[in-house]
């Protein structure tokens, strides 16, 4: 029976602290981390995930890479017998309330921005977001003769060359490629440092000169050189009904509105496609999984316009699947989706935000599975209670345990955010160990589960028109069971109600939480976990 049940095993990883390598690019917490890793091994965890910060490694100058601290960290992980998921973190860490760590993108890159501030994402008020370079400069050779895509490719190449021993040994099994703020493939549409607060719809962030020029050229190409960006979209903290664009039957449905939304979201897909193609070339032949992170924009999901998703770059409507198009692009690169919100329940959300995290998770996971992708998830808030763990378990195997082999649909892996003493002590640790056992289908930890084949070359380039064929018709998601069939202990009354956006911005669990909800210690949807940073 065990041989058949083994196909239900879902790997569990734990995200390391944001400052596992210090802001001075030194490995200073070896003793503390070593003790915590022992606890993870005891719990049966398969591996860990870590941000590999661009701002630290290439901080001293163009191509002046310093990997020494990360090598020490990776050696510690290897000695613990754990696998490693490495995030190519091309974004800034820090800049918001609650962020204990501040790691900007390299100073020499920011210096280019003093001469040309349009290298940064820009909102309609002219405010620059310095957490991540605008996709408008992907192919612009503005950075000491290199384009943004070339800088990212060179960084990944140097990583491969310097971490070859860990790649060859099978320690590094996953390369998650940062594609935007908080490491997510999205626009910085809801920056707290610009005054955004939950559940604001956010704003379209495409006002740098490079994206403006691209839009004008695209509009002229379809015979409408007079078209401008929409001016009826409201501001960061509006609700959909307060805007002409997002309200029911609003101008987002007009010819001009549809053209703009397609242009905005298509550029994001092309951005991901370009950088993943480079990542594929860099890691070609190595036994690694390429992955990207998609943000869980769950607020306003229940309104027709899906306003907050649209401003983030996810063109998702009741009759248009904005996530399957992304999955179709990823299929070319055999890359996986890493999604968040896996622990969230609709009933924990504020009714005014029209949130539906459970339906969103169901849609995104189904989109990935329909395209034949490996699909992974994370939690949004640090939670330690059976209620949250059981929601994750339900999403990990939405049809339950299959006694005769691998289930038709299951997560490829789950990453818990994040490692702390609170996780590995007392009842929290007891619950976590039980959760890991349940994710493993009550089987012993297996370091050889889901072996990776050498990464093949990406498939032939496909046109955006072919990618968009995945958007319609929008199919119903696969059915999910209401509850897991392999639960962690009692579930009653242990959740609490989420007051803020808990996928991408933190938020606080409202009401009695019994030590299980609390405030997000840091990023809740970002690859590294930090809140979206803007200045």
Swiss-Prot record:
Listed name of the protein: Beta-amylase
SUPFAM superfamilies: (Trans)glycosidases
Stretch list, region 4 X 11 AA tandem repeats: 489-532
Active site: 184, 378
Gene Ontology terms: biological process: polysaccharide catabolic process
Pfam family, one: Glyco_hydro_14
Sequence repeats: 489-499, 500-510, 511-521, 522-532
Enzyme class: hydrolase
Chain sites annotated for binding substrate: 51, 91, 99, 293, 298, 340, 379-380, 418
Organism taxonomic ancestry: Eukaryota, Viridiplantae, Streptophyta, Embryophyta, Tracheophyta
Reactions mediated catalytically: Hydrolysis of (1->4)-alpha-D-glucosidic linkages in polysaccharides so as to remove successive maltose units from the non-reducing ends of the chains
InterPro entries, A to Z: Glyco_hydro_14 (IPR001554), Glyco_hydro_14_CS (IPR018238), Glyco_hydro_14B_pln (IPR001371), Glycoside_hydrolase_SF (IPR017853)
UniProtKB keywords: Carbohydrate metabolism, Glycosidase, Hydrolase, Polysaccharide degradation, Repeat
Subunit text: Monomer.
Gene from which the chain derives: BMY1
PROSITE patterns in the cross-refs: BETA_AMYLASE_1 (PS00506), BETA_AMYLASE_2 (PS00679)
Similarity section: Belongs to the glycosyl hydrolase 14 family.
Coiled coil: none
One annotated GO molecular function: beta-amylase activity
Stretch list, region Disordered: 513-535
Enzyme Commission identifier(s): 3.2.1.2
């Amino acid at each position: 029976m065990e041989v058949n049940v083994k196909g239900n095993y879902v790997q569990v990883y734990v995200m390391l602290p944001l400052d596992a390598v210090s802001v001075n690019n030194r490995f200073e917490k070896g003793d503390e981390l070593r003790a915590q890793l022992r606890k993870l091994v005891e719990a049966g965890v398969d591996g860990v995930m870590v941000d590999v910060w661009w701002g630290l490694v290439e901080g001293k100058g163009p191509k002046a890479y310093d990997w020494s601290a990360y090598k020490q960290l990776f050696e510690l992980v290897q000695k613990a017998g754990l696998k490693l998921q490495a995030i190519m973190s091309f974004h800034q860490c820090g800049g918001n309330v609650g962020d204990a760590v501040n790691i900007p993108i390299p100073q020499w890159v920011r210096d280019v921005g003093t001469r040309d501030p349009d290298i940064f994402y820009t909102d309609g008020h002219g405010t620059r977001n310095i957490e991540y370079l605008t996709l408008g400069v992907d192919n612009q050779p503005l950075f000491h003769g290199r384009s943004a895509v070339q800088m990212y490719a060179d960084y990944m190449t140097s990583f491969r060359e310097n971490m070859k021993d860990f790649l060859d040994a099978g320690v590094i099994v996953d390369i998650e490629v940062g594609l935007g703020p908080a490491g997510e493939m999205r626009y910085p549409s809801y920056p707290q440092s610009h005054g955004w607060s939950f559940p604001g719809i956010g704003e379209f962030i495409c006002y740098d000169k490079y994206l403006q020029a691209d839009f004008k050229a695209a509009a002229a190409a379809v015979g409408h050189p007079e078209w401008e960006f929409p001016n009826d979209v409201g501001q960061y903290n509006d609700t959909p009904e307060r805007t002409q664009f997002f309200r029911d039957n609003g101008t987002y449905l007009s010819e001009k509105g549809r053209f703009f939304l397609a242009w905005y979201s298509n550029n994001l897909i092309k951005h991901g496609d370009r950088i993943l193609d480079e990542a594929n070339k860099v890691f070609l032949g190595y036994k690694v999984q390429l992955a990207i992170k998609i943000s869980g924009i769950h607020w306003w999901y229940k309104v027709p316009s899906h306003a907050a998703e649209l401003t983030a770059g996810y063109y998702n409507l009741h009759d248009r699947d904005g996530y399957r198009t992304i999955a179709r692009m990823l299929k070319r690169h055999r890359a996986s989706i890493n999604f968040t919100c896996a622990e969230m329940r609709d009933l924990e959300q504020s009714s005014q935000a029209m949130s539906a995290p459970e339906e969103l998770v169901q849609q995104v996971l189904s989109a990935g599975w329909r395209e034949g992708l490996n699909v992974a998830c994370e939690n949004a808030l640090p939670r330690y209670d059976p209620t949250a763990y059981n929601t994750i378990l339900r999403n990990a195997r939405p049809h339950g345990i299959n006694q005769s082999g691998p289930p038709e649909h299951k997560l490829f892996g789950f990453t818990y955010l994040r490692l702390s003493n609170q996780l590995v002590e007392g009842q929290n640790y007891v619950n976590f160990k039980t959760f890991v056992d349940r994710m493993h289908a009550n089987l012993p930890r297996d370091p050889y589960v889901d072996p990776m084949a050498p990464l093949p070359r990406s498939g032939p380039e496909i046109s955006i028109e072919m990618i968009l064929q995945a958007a319609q018709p929008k199919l119903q998601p696969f059915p999910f069971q209401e509850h897991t069939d392999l639960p962690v202990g009692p579930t009653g009354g242990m959740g609490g109600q989420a007051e803020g956006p808990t996928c991408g911005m933190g938020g606080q669990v409202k009401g009695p939480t019994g030590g299980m909800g609390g405030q997000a210690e840091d990023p809740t949807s970002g690859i590294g976990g930090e809140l979206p940073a803007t200045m």
